[in-house]
Amino acid sequence: MSERTELIRKLGSSKFNYWFGYAANISLVIWLCSHGIAGGKSRLTPGQWIGWSAVGFFSWTLSEFLLHRYVYHLWESFLSEGHALHHRTPRALIGVPWYLTAIALWAVFEALCLVTRPQITGVVMGFNWLGYILYCIAHHGSHHWSLRWNWFKRMQRHHLIHHAHPECNWGFTTPIWDYLFGTDFDRRRAPATAKPTQ
């Protein structure tokens, strides 16, 4: 194991980092969404809250696909090394160090606030990050839980296929992007196994 990979393993695989990351991320969601409130009053209308939170939550699904495909698999970085470590030891508690996540999220927020209103940016990013937290819970569950819910079983199967075939199934909680971009394992395999028509 290279020195860099060993450092990544040490930074990202402590139980404290893994579990505290959830608390830190929930705090980030609250901090981001608090920009939609000032002096105890909402800075957005109820319709804006609903609309912008939906945009944020939906944007997570595409963010998840793009991060997983490019940052974790195609581009070489400490994040891709950490993700490769996860592929080798899928049940290990490995996560991006919580403080790096917080710094990155703060920097993106500040940059976006240069071109948008902070209350909108905060709500969109807050609900985007809520999607990330739900993804983390579902991802953990796919490797550690055995639930009988059909949705969970489909999601788990989709993800475990990705571990066996890392070139596909990059969308995890929402495989719709794999369908749209042609990276779904079942759809890629279907033409090869389909019987010719008469």
Sequence positions of predicted segments:
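Interfacial helix-loop-helix junctions of multi-pass membrane proteins
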Residues: S142-K153
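Non-catalytic, topology-defining segments of multipass membrane proteins
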Residues: M1-Y132, E167-Q198
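Functionally important transmembrane alpha-helices
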Residues: L134, W151-L160
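Detector for the Zn2+-coordinating histidines of canonical Cys2His2
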Residues: H86-H87, H159-H162
